[in-house]
Amino acid sequence: MEATASMGLQGLNGVSYDLSQLDNYLSHATTYVNGNQHLQHPSLPNERISGTVDLSEPPAKRLRRSPSCNESNESNGETSSPAAIIDPSTRLQDVNGGLDRVAGGSESADSMTHDSNEDTSNILSGSATSVSLMYEPSQKNSTPPSTVNNVPSSSSITSDSKGLSGNTDYARYRPRSSIPSKLTAAVYAQQCVTAAYACRLNPYSLHKKEQEALQDHLCHLHVTAYLNIRNGILRLWTRNPMVSVTKDEALGCAKDYRWMGLASFAYEWLVRNGYINFGCVEIPPALVAPKKGRRKDGPVIVVIGAGMAGLGCARQLEGLFKQYHDPLTSPRVVVLEGRRRIGGRIYSHPLRSLQSSKLAPGVVPKAEMGAQIIVGFEHGNPLDQIIRGQLALPYHLLRDISTIYDIDGSAVDEVQDAMDERLYIDVLDRSGLYRHNAVIVPTAEGDRRLIDSGRDLTMSDGLTVRQYEEARAAGTVELLFPNKKVRRGVGHKTADIKATIPPVPTDLGPAEEQPAALACQAMGWKLKDGVPPTASLNLDPVAKASMWPTLGAVMDEGVKQYQRMLPLTPKDMRLINWHFANLEYANATNIGKLSLSGWDQDLGNEFEGEHSQVIGGYQQVPYGLWSLPTKLDVRTNKIVSKIAYDSTGSGKRKTVVHCEDGESFVADKVVFTASLGVLKHHSIEFSPPLPDWKRGAIERLGFGVMNKVILVFEEPFWDTERDMFGLLREPKNRDSMVQEDYAANRGRFYLFWNCMKTTGLPVLIALMAGDAAHQAEYTPDGEIIAEVTSQLRNIFKHVAVPDPLETIITRWASDRFTRGSYSYVAAQALPGDYDLMAKPVGNLHFAGEATCGTHPATVHGAYLSGLRAASEIIESVLGPIEIPNPLVPEKGKAIELGTSVATAQKKKEPPCSNGFSAPVSTSAHPTDASAPARSNNSFSGDTALRQAYEQAMWAAIHAELGPPEPRPARTGLNPFLLYQKDYWGKARAQCDETKQATTKDPNAKAARDEIRQALGLMWRQASEEEKRPYIEQTEVNRQTNTEIWDRWKQNTKEWERKSLEIKKRWCAANPFETWQPPAKR
């Protein structure tokens, strides 16, 4: 698990400095056309004061393809994200020029509007961080505040916008248009499978929500075709997450017109559920015909909290409302944040004692007060697409801890460390035998062999997914197929379905198979005299002694029993308890409070890859979500005091959100993303009160705390190539062998992070975990700083360790906006409590890390919960995805003629005389002119003749009207592409010169991607005067395209009308029953 916390400032000096630094980034308020004064939003906090390009500003949009390889510096682990791609014309005002004001007429996201010399009591009431400096900081006044009007009440939620799949004209799309023709089927299939894993989906089986929607509409044999299409759409997204996947592209993943319904559903399901088109990506508005009528207000969605969950939800809603654009409605999303900044428990605090020469010019060094670690980008972490694919933030890959220091300052022997760690893992594994085993319901699976080879199964037996799965669960599948020939030998692999997430093991193997004594010998331990190799641990008495057993009690008992088997020393006890402290850091609480059966209920959902940190501050991520592609409406300093919601969810009553400053907001839907700690402290009144089932989950789950001590030094005195080092702690009785004695102190400065790679300064961050985290809440600053400095001097005796120049101590439990750090599974928690936390109450929805049962206590879990809440809201507004009936047409049946000219142009499945296509049989057909008498109901032997009949009909139509006008191409809508044509030569020359200078090769040439990146930089740095002609040209092109498109649609409509008249006339003169093909000459 990962810490997800953030903090406010405490103390006048800390507040005034924070304001003075952030004021350098601020611009003045702007007034919108409607008269509401609206503050501009800040761009990313690492904005360069000089106005040069920020690292988070992506270069220009490129075609969807494989992302470029990361450039890694193996010596220090620093990695640059792949160059993110975006249309720069829509981004320039977002990043260049410094941090703007945040939203809605309230105070700025990272500043306050009061004079720093004014009374700060109100500001400090909710803050809990101590900041100290060895010098007096300069004071700087900030800009006065501006006012904001209330959000107007909207009319009832509109549902006029149709789903993306509703009434779709599939014939206008091209099958296989998104499948690269140069790739072999197997290679393409492997890319699709990899993409599904990268998006947290099983490439071989349906997600449970997919199955719920499709089970009555989809033939179980067509699951393979659906998965191939869905995985193909995911491939498009993962290849370049800077470009949203369009419906045209998605339907191009179908290999045949017959699968267009599947592709349409897959696309809309992936969009709605946040598997594609999420994050800082531009979503083009849906192309819908203008409507006549009065404009009306769309739904107003108020999101409470501007952390990762709140910003992620708001950003996703903005994108979904664009995707489901209705010209007559204007939905609004407003985010209310109680702090003066955004980011929630992600807070990168500016350091002011030193300036860094290692960071880019103008970038302020920052220390992470809360969330700090990205726990692997691979296997589905959505932060991969945002951090590396969209914002292109540099990050530092972390190395595992290699050195732990003992209480005397000496490094612990690696062999002893390894033996004690294995012993700790053994105790933890044996405690896992009491884990609650979740029941995982399998879902329908496709044919793995066909999916891996990129092939579809086209046959149908008429059984839906529900029918087949129910029979499979009942063991009656064989009764469905009395004649094996019906299935033509094709097996459907569902009996051994693998779940979307790896199943929780029923036991942990070695702990049950091997006696404890024998396991210890295998670790390198020598048993005490008289202990037989068959001796083992008996944890049952402790595990079953209480109705609510805890992990801590059982693990403590395991250590005690090992003391009777092994010659453990006080040093071994310190080492084992260091690992206990590390587990307490992961859970933000003493392990004595964790549920024995459910503490690791997220097991199996871990992401893969090395852990990393964002260089320059993690807070760039929420700032990027907030500001790109367009700024969200965020109102800071809006402390919510009461939420009067509609518990029925009928839509007849509005929700009113009341703030402490007297302002109120009327909304159709509310998303509550404040922490579980806020809910536990009853800081906000709910009217009506939350139901018992919701309050029960709030009470049963735990909300812990983890604190940090941040130390800034003049020079580093530690090994700067190591990312972290550990420190063993001793109990009050130094040589105690009593396990319980170690609990209070084991997490006190147990781990130090070396943050030079991310801050550019000599910075150490000491962690306070378990009981020590609570001790930090009330221990004076001076005592904490003196102790941690003394410990460092004890370790590094060979150098004179100075006093730190700057110190910051976090106190998350005292922060009124969080009341802690992150959630954990407490002893009395029930298996479904995280799901209950996520469940909406009427029109009140919930998001945040404590509502994400698969990834709790993490930044990515908070973000995923925001995507889930956005999906719930869009479904409540629009209803479920529309599924056509039939979802998959019968094999050989073509698309209706009148839907598009494309059908006539294909002429693969020609329509019959009644205007609808006749099924084409795959059986043999006669080819001679003396075919037996036929009727429209006999389709078995006349395929070739029907094709000849249709060809003759279309030849007559084309002879009279000519072929239909081809669909016009839309061109010239990206000003950057026009700019690129003019400046490509200049950029290439500059890149070649740079390449030749760095490689010292006079013939070196820059790669095409390097030239594109340089062009993106040139475009972003270009003046408005240079850009104006290209932007104006795109507007001209847009108008021209509209005129051409309208003319083409009119011409096509007229051609279709005339072709239908000719067709009827020709068919009347040449009835199919008597028509014979002309004799061959």
From Swiss-Prot:
Keyword Cytoplasm annotated: no
Compartment annotation: Nucleus
Pfam families: Amino_oxidase, NAD_binding_8, SWIRM
SWIRM domain mapped to chain residues: 192-287
EC nos: 1.14.99.-
Gene Ontology terms: cellular component: nucleus
Top EC group: oxidoreductase
UniProt KW keywords: DNA-binding, Nucleus, Oxidoreductase
InterPro entries recorded: Amino_oxidase, FAD/NAD-bd_sf, Flavin_monoamine_oxidase, HMG_box_dom, HMG_box_dom_sf, Homeodomain-like_sf, SWIRM, WH-like_DNA-bd_sf
Keyword Oxidoreductase included in the entry's annotation: yes
DNA-binding residue intervals: 969-1049
Residue numbers spanned by region Disordered: 37-173, 902-940
Superkingdom, natural source: Eukaryota
Disruption phenotype: Does not affect whole genome H3K4 methylation.
Sequence ranges of Polar residues compositional bias: 119-132, 914-925
PROSITE patterns: HMG_BOX_2, SWIRM
Gene Ontology MF term list: chromatin binding; DNA binding; FAD-dependent H3K4me/H3K4me3 demethylase activity; flavin adenine dinucleotide binding
Primary location recorded for the protein, binned into one broad class: nucleus
Family: Belongs to the flavin monoamine oxidase family.
PANTHER family per the UniProt record, alphabetical: FLAVIN MONOAMINE OXIDASE (PTHR10742), LYSINE-SPECIFIC HISTONE DEMETHYLASE 1A (PTHR10742:SF386)
Function: H3K4 demethylase-like protein. Might not act as a H3K4 demethylase or is not the major H3K4 demethylase since its deletion does not affect whole genome H3K4 methylation.
Protein name according to UniProt: Histone demethylase-like protein A
